[in-house]
């Protein structure tokens, strides 16, 4: 797993796989969560339940707004999303003399959408293929927001519905982006240099108790992100693409993946008898200058 890069979801810091992270900062609110490089995460807006938004269920799931976050670095990624009504289930059992009862469970019809990314040579292309299928209550007319993780502002932003380029307008704040509703043939773009992932208590419909909690003041600042919102369209009719020129998503603190031929092996490996207990064996060795960690292979 060493060549694989993993990205801390909450900070954007990148790590190489195949290692143990010691002294990892994980306060009470933070579940250690790492995203594999080139992963794609489709989602809906934040909600409290899977039921549709109504006057009495204001914090339900609004399926008319889809959000797709891309964690591209270099290379390609792909993810197929399956969506259904979230409630249909049918079990038709059959009997087999040798086996017994056989369950045949169906969750009804569904819609599938393939999302993909390709980043190479300073250009990244993100694609939402035309959705396939249907289910009861499905509406393919949706707005789409692409979120691309980056480490610098891209040089160019090109958004397309099918083969038609959209008129992309840049806004100057996250609030302006969130409030924008692009018209047909339009898209809205915002580069957020230091996004704050903590939205708790900031919604217009938040309760007074939620607004008054001290956690609201906690900043969860992550790496820069590019936000592009497409106008509402029939997502089953054509693919949607976003191309970023001058794309880069690299962590300057990420150690180079190369072997140091001049690094010496530790000497004087020992297990002092006076430090051995019934449940542990303490190992000691000589310090190696330039070493950042030591790996031990234990046989037995």
Where are the language model's segments positioned?
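Catalytic core of carbohydrate-active enzymes
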Residues: 1-163, 174-176, 181, 193-211, ...
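Short aromatic-glycine-(Arg/Gly/Cys) micro-motifs in beta-strand/loop hairpins
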Residues: 187-190
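Short beta-strand elements bearing conserved aromatic residues within extracellular beta-rich modules
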Residues: 157, 294-296
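Non-cytosolic beta-sheet module surface loops
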Residues: 148-150, 286-289, 298
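Short strand-turn-strand beta-turns centered on an Asx-Gly dipeptide
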Residues: 159-167, 299-300
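Pro/Thr/Ser/Gly-rich low-complexity, intrinsically disordered linker/stalk tracts
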Residues: 259-290
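Mature N-terminal, pre-catalytic/accessory segment of carbohydrate-active enzymes
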Residues: 248-260
